Amino acid sequence: MKKSFFSVPRTLPLHALTTFLIGVGCVWPLSLSLGLTAPLSLCLTACGAVTLLFALLDCMPRLRALAYPLLLLAIGGSALSLRGQFSAVGAALTLMVHGQPLALAAYSQELSLLLSLVFTGIGASLSRSEQAFFPLALLEIALLFIVSFLGAQIGAASLLPLILALLLGGE
């Protein structure tokens, strides 16, 4: 029997929602704790674009293998947008840890985009796994540890997407 070019998997809505929630749930608290001043809409747009990419390629079985190479290409392009400024970003991160909260503001949009792409890609991997509850719980604990280590006061609302993704991923 010939495979169709486009078929919608039964679990697509759950996987897409979980992917999006993991991306937003990781990037939003990290952005707040790092003092990144990029608008939340940039994060939502990047997470939505990666989620849409994975959802569309899940519907096309013959092209499904292109999802991660395309994501890696986008991450590489985002990292190249910093063009040799990695040492400056590292120095700004060191200054931020030592009490200069506005040190990373100059790199806010690039870092928000990079974090959104990376964490939504991780979310896409975790949302498609049957045993994703414990890795997702470990990711949430690590995120809480990083946020508390940075000493930032973030609202509880920024943690809700990741908690909801944890509950959805446990099904």
Q: How does the language model describe each region?
A:
Residues 1-171:
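Linear, non-domain "peripheral" regions
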